[in-house]
Every structure is written in C-alpha cells, then in structure tokens.
Design a protein with these regions (language model features):
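Glycine- and Gly-Pro-enriched alpha-helical subdomains that act as flexible
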Residues: 1-21
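Generic low-polarity alpha-helical segments
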Residues: 2, 16, 42, 54-57, ...
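Intrinsically disordered, low-complexity segments enriched in polar/charged residues with Gly/Pro
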Residues: 2-5, 28, 66, 76, ...
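Polymerase palm active-site segment centered on the conserved acidic dipeptide of motif C
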Residues: 5-12, 41-103, 182, 186-194
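Divalent metal-binding acidic/histidine catalytic loops
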Residues: 20-33, 38, 85-87, 91, ...
C-alpha cells in the first residue's frame, strides 16, 4: 500500500555533498528497514541517518515511528546481539517450550534425529475417510513446526517436506511421527542461528550427520 501511495517515491533526493555523516565511523552510512504491518525493525550504523529518517516521517505525517529499544522479539523469534563481535543470533526456544506444553510433551524424552532412518511414512495406510479431528491436530502441529524450520531450525526442512504430504489425510501414526520431530526440537532448542560480523576470525559451517545415528 505504501508503494501504491507513492510513499517511497516522494522521499527527497539528498545532494551528494550532504550524504556524508561526520558522526558515522563507517565508510557508508546504512539504514535497513524491514516493513511488516506495524512491526518495522531498523538496523543502522549511523544515528544521524536514523534521526534524519525520523524527521522525514514526522514531516510527512502519514506514518508515525516510535523507538522501542533494541530488537528482542519479532514474530515469535527471539534475537540476541553481541556488542563486542557484532554478531546477531536468534532462536525460538519459547515457542518450542509452548508447543511441548500444548501437546503434553513437556517431560518427554528427546531424540537425536527428527525422524528415524527406518521410518517409512509412505507405507502407512491411508483411510478412505480420515478422522477430521486427527487431521486438524496434525495440520496444526505441522504448520507450527514449519514456521520453526523456516526461521531457526533448517535441519528439519527435509523431514517437514515429508510430513506436509499428509496434511489432509493424516492418521494417528502420522501424528506420532510429527510429535517425534517435536522431541528432536526439545533437544536442540538451546541452539541459535548466528550471523557473524564480516571480520569474524573463525568462519565455519556446522552440519548434522544422522546416517549413523
């Protein structure tokens, strides 16, 4: 809607000689704004640039901006900032804890892998008329697991691609497999996805090896 209303097109062009912020310690001053309904987190490296943007919004009058401090939560994701290294990390532990409580699995045992290599979802019998209650519960759990997989636990992506094939014809057995993935999440919910600063000294990639589990 903002694009249709010409909001961004009406922003004034800053002359070249006025684009340098003396207070900015970086070669290029940057302001990144993620627009999502009324939650618009900003990431910037120059306070003057942010203040100029706030002045523009106030002058324009159509959008109000309010500072609420450092980003800690957004759309169910918890963020952490390391002021020393500049690294940013995130996790969804509170969401996983809530899911465990929702499905009565708070005290369940954990698993090292989200789905056993010997599991064969395709061999499970599919009823002609699936139980609507089971299908609804299954679809709800899988949808919640998908959101976690997309944002902070990408290693369960393949398992989710298997589970989503039965969204409208799931049985109790399928539901049990989905809860098995939740058991796995309980064991890894303290892990975080981290984006390191550009000058990180020890860049590496970590991967899961489940074949021998």
């Amino acid at each position: 809607d903002m694009l249709k209303q010409g909001y961004f097109q009406t922003m004034e062009t800053v002359p070249m000689e006025k684009r340098i912020y003396k207070s900015c310690p970086h070669p290029v001053a940057a302001l990144i704004i993620a627009v999502y309904v009324d939650n618009n987190p900003c990431r910037f490296n120059c306070i003057d640039l942010l203040e100029d943007f706030e002045k523009f919004l106030k002058k324009d009058g159509r959008i109000k901006m309010q500072r609420e401090g450092k980003l800690e939560w957004l759309l169910g994701i918890r963020y952490h900032f390391d002021e020393v290294t500049g690294a940013v990390s995130c996790d969804q532990k509170p969401s996983i804890v809530a899911l465990l409580a929702k499905y009565g699995m708070t005290d369940c045992n954990t698993t090292k892998i989200p789905l056993s290599p010997s599991s064969d979802l395709e061999s499970l019998p599919i009823p002609d008329k699936p139980d609507e209650v089971v299908v609804k519960l299954y679809a709800s759990l899988v949808g919640e697991l998908l959101y976690i997989a997309i944002n902070t636990v990408p290693q369960i992506s393949y398992i989710m691609s298997c589970l989503t094939r039965y969204m409208t014809r799931a049985t109790e057995a399928h539901f049990t497999y989905a809860k098995g993935t939740l058991r796995y999440l309980k064991g890894v919910m303290d892990r975080k996805i981290t984006w390191c600063a550009a000058n990180a000294r020890d860049p590496h990639v970590r991967h899961e090896i489940w074949a021998g589990a």
